[in-house]
A protein has these predicted regions:
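Short, solvent-exposed loop/turn segments at secondary-structure boundaries
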Residues: 42-43, 76-81, 119
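Glycine/Thr-rich beta-alpha phosphate-binding loop at enzyme active sites
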Residues: 107-127
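Basic, amphipathic juxtamembrane/active-site segments
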Residues: 35-54
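Non-catalytic pre-domain segments flanking phosphatase-related domains
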Residues: 1-25
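Conserved Lys-Pro-Asp/Glu-containing loop-to-beta segment of HAD-superfamily phosphomonoesterases
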Residues: 120-146
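Asp-based phosphoryl-transfer active-site loop
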Residues: 17-34, 68
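Substrate-recognition element of Asp-dependent hydrolases with the DxDx(T/V) motif
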Residues: 50, 54-90, 100-113
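Conserved hydrophobic residues forming the short capping helix/wall of the S-adenosyl-L-methionine
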Residues: 90-95, 136, 140
Length: 146
């Protein structure tokens, strides 16, 4: 029996089996210059070659996902809302160059955090893997992947 191949929204579907590639990227030091606890747009600077590299990944069928530790929240240097504003701006800047980030996942926790709400030894802080599994689960639903 032949299983029809078809392309749907950048994924290849073979019957009910779907394949997708995901590139998991860190933010600070990978996407932007790491200047310690960046949360202001004025402090954010894309690294040279990053935009063209992201384009190449995207053109080769990768969903682009950022996974980043943001302990500045736990330290009280900035708030989660500040990160969200920065990420929204970053998405808009990348979109101008034809680059789409599927989603950003971040860990605001730290075992010895200044802000009690964020003081925990969590499983989402890299190099632990909770955020990666969360991303895969959410993206499977979002892109209807099996």
């Amino acid at each position: 029996m032949d299983i029809p191949n078809k392309v749907i929204k950048g994924k290849i579907a073979l019957g009910k089996i779907c394949f997708h590639k995901i590139a998991f990227l860190d933010r600070d030091g990978t996407i932007n210059k790491d200047k310690n606890y960046i949360y202001k747009i004025d402090d954010f600077e894309f690294l040279p070659g990053v935009i063209s590299g992201l384009k190449k990944l995207q053109q080769n069928g990768f969903l682009l996902v950022i996974v980043t530790n943001q302990s500045g929240v736990a330290r009280g240097y900035y708030k989660e809302e500040d990160i969200e504003v920065l990420h929204k701006w970053m998405f808009q800047e990348l979109e101008k160059s034809g680059v789409s980030i599927a989603k950003v996942y971040y860990c605001p926790h730290l075992p010895d955090a200044t802000i009690e709400k964020y003081r925990k030894n969590c499983n989402c802080r890299k190099p632990k893997t909770e955020l990666y599994y969360k991303a895969i689960s959410e993206l499977k639903r979002l892109y209807d992947l099996d």
